[in-house]
From Swiss-Prot:
PANTHER family: TRANSTHYRETIN, URICASE AND TRANSTHYRETIN-RELATED. The lineage of its organism: Eukaryota, Metazoa, Chordata, Craniata, Vertebrata. The keyword Cell division does not apply. It is found in: Secreted. One of its GO terms (molecular function) is thyroid hormone binding. It comes from Xenopus tropicalis (Western clawed frog). This is Transthyretin.
Length: 151
């Protein structure tokens, strides 16, 4: 069990790192990107490409769809939401995991998976949400940083 927990921690750190070849770091090309999502397929040990991701904001108890997109071949989505849209509040990122796993011929447990979090309650910040997926589990972490100044 300790080995599995160590593996998960290392995998999440690898997702959140900027070590991928040819990868442009969040601070370089995406200084205006307030929310970035990174997803890893832990079964195959590769980025989870073409995964549908939707971003919702809680408005008076209702979830309002703000934006949606699919992960790239690097398992990432940049600029899924603008600074103007990403105001203080509670957000939900919904991952269409059932569709993703079914396309790979697997029968997953979850219909979809949500990551719900409060954003910008201590001033404007940049958020990177990293997610590790299997057909029966999810693990997520967040890297929250100060916004980058334009050069």
């Amino acid at each position: 069990m300790a080995f599995f927990k160590s593996f998960l921690l290392l995998a999440l750190l690898a997702i959140a790192s900027e070590a991928a070849p040819g990868h442009v770091s969040h601070g370089e090309a995406d200084s205006k990107c307030p929310l970035m999502v990174k997803v890893l397929d832990a079964v195959r040990g590769i980025p989870a490409a073409n995964l549908l991701v939707q971003v919702f904001r809680n408005t008076e108890g209702n979830w309002e769809l703000i934006s949606s997109g699919k992960t790239t071949e690097l398992g990432e989505i940049h600029n899924i939401i603008t600074d103007e849209q990403f105001t203080e509040g509670v957000y939900k990122i919904e991952f269409a995991t059932k569709t993703f796993w079914r396309k790979l011929g697997l029968s997953p447990f979850h219909e979809y998976v949500d990551v719900v979090f409060s954003a910008n309650d201590a001033g404007h910040r940049h958020y990177t949400i990293a997610v590790l997926l299997t057909p029966y589990s999810i693990s997520s972490t967040a890297v929250v940083s100060e916004p980058h100044d334009d050069l």
